[in-house]
């Protein structure tokens, strides 16, 4: 997967911005048994064949498993909850992987581009193109445009200028406040923190 490949990269003298996403224990302050809730919305031009628009709730539950902490992600659209396989040994928030894979899938469906090629461009951008800006008292916003300098921009339509944004705050449950991808009016997707309990 995209996130695991990036996290396994070689050590650098200075920590890359991507460490805030992939090498930070986002869920360290979420106790076993607690739940963190997010909203998930996707809107796209029907002509792109990305799939139906999404307006769902996501619940992230932390538990102690046999091999340590594990996280269960439940997607709930229209009262039909669906659990993903538990995430084990992931240092960051597993919703990051869910979001990145959803984004790659959307670009693939809209453009016909190879998912392997698209994942590699996303991984490259996460490694080399993230920019940082402050958000609120202690938060950070990381932004990238993964296809900004891509040799195949002409084949990507509105996705050539797609902007991906991550908002991280150390005092927020799960640390990820929001993740979004936007390609003009053709496509937008966002996962946003709602609450925890």
Q: Locations of the language-model features?
A:
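Bacterial N-terminal signal peptides
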Residues: 1-7
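Acidic, serine/threonine-rich low-complexity disordered tracts
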Residues: 13-87, 108-197
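Acidic/charged, solvent-exposed loop-and-adjacent secondary-structure segments enriched in E/D, K/R, S/T
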Residues: 85-108
């Amino acid at each position: 997967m995209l996130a695991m490949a990036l996290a396994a990269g070689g050590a650098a003298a200075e920590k890359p911005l991507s460490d805030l996403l992939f090498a930070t224990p986002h869920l360290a302050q979420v106790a076993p048994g607690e739940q963190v809730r997010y909203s998930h919305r996707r809107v796209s031009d029907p002509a792109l064949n990305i799939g139906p628009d999404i307006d769902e709730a996501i619940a992230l539950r932390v538990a102690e498993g046999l091999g340590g902490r594990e996280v269960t992600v439940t997607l709930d659209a229209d009262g039909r909850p669906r659990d993903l396989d538990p995430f084990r040994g992931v240092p960051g928030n597993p919703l990051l992987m869910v979001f990145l894979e959803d984004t790659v899938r959307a670009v693939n469906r809209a453009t016909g581009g190879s998912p392997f090629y698209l994942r590699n461009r996303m991984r490259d951008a996460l490694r080399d193109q993230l920019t940082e800006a402050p958000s609120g008292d202690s938060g950070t916003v990381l932004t990238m445009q993964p296809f900004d300098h891509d040799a195949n921009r002409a084949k990507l339509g509105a996705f050539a200028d797609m902007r991906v944004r991550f908002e991280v705050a150390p005092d927020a449950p799960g640390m990820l406040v929001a993740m979004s991808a936007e390609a003009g009016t053709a496509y937008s997707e966002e996962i946003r923190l709602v609450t925890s309990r």
